[in-house]
Amino acid sequence: RQGPLNHTRDSFNPQIEELRRDYPQLIQFESATLDFSIEQIRRNLRHREALVEYFISGPEPSGKEELFIFVVTKKECHVCRSPVDSTFYQELATITQNLHGFVPYLETRERFDSLKAALFGVYQMTIDPVRSYFSNKKLIIVPDEILSIVPFDALITHLDSSSISNYAGAPYLLHEYDISYMYNSQLIDHQSPRAWRFPSVTAWLPGDATASRSSFGNLKGAVEEVQDILKLVKGRSVQKSMDKQDLVEILQERAILHLAMHSLATDISGSSPYFILDSVADPLLANQLHDYEINALHLSSPMVVLSSCETAVGQLYRGEGIMSLSRSFMQAGAPSVVHSLWPVEDAKSREIMVGFYGELKKGIPKSSALSKVKRQYLDQQPPFYTHPYYWAAFQITGDTSPVYSKRNYFLIAGSILIAFLIFAYFRRLSFFRRD
């Protein structure tokens, strides 16, 4: 006799088989999920990379939570566990309030000290316990739950009040590591072994340019950003009023996709994250492209850059993580996505984005490019603009391999020289034959 659980399971079988038939990659994913191991992670790690994955356990019978930290390098793996108390969540709340809710004219010495202490406290909880396990230069962070909204490169590695008088002098983790992120450690199996040759950029800017990125009007700073980027790398910009289908077609191009547009993590209706395709004052009246619509696409882009507000933010589901626009692009097949944790001031966003493409063009890994331009930004800015709000929002998630091939100028010069010598030899040979 069949019980109710078996009956329910059997009733789903036809739908599951239909999904497997319509989406054959699902079978590959199921198989990979079952067979994936620590050894595979180690094999896929590149030179000087370490993967650090976090897991916050549910409340134990005693009411306590624990933070598990898994560290995997090429040669070894380690696990560390520590209790989670209310202080940890208070520090995370302080970081969120001071970065996601940054207001320049409200900055005080008290807020500076509070944020500094919180960034150090989270470092002590998340990185310091396992730091002795890796001497690697590159960290791949796989965050869990609320840790997904933490900019790890802005964490402070030591607290010395006498030497840290402003944000410019803070010992950020950024100064020691190139940091990237992954939603799941299994995604490391999908990293590209080589760079694309010379990919072009397709940048999309809806409407005209008359307002800032922080308001729901047209985009002004984003246009200048795209113009500067296209002076560095080949590509095109599309700036006109378009409907959803126009954008969907662009998203399926085999190019680096740069989207400088408005987005919302949610709204008063509780909607899922979406892009705003029109330049209107009220986003609820705008033409929208939702995260679940992006999920259904099949992307061919080597990288998606979301130069928009809060593209890494969304609803948090326990056991699943944050459902964001960035995650939707990963699920649609993008190997890597650059996203933001909070709305960024126009001029600083432009500076970091343009610098990022400049470094990418040199053929270096994406995480190294983004980290390098952030360090350069901190070196060049006056103290107030070194507040993490201005530079720490942007993160690279997924594959970190170079997107542009590095030009070997010695090889090019050598090839030209050899070609010239061959040409000169045959020219001289033909001259003597005529004589």
List where the protein language model places each region:
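An often Trp-containing, charged/polar helix-loop segment at the C-terminal end
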Residues: 7, 195-197, 348-435
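Catalytic cores of nucleophile-dependent amide-cleaving enzymes
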Residues: 183, 190, 255-351
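Functional beta-strand-loop-alpha-helix junction segments that form "active/interaction loops"
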Residues: 28, 33-38, 111-114, 216-271, ...
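Peri-functional-center coupling elements
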Residues: 3, 7-14, 18, 25, ...
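Active-site-proximal beta-strand/loop segments in catalytic clefts of secreted hydrolases
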Residues: 54-55, 142-145, 177, 182-184, ...
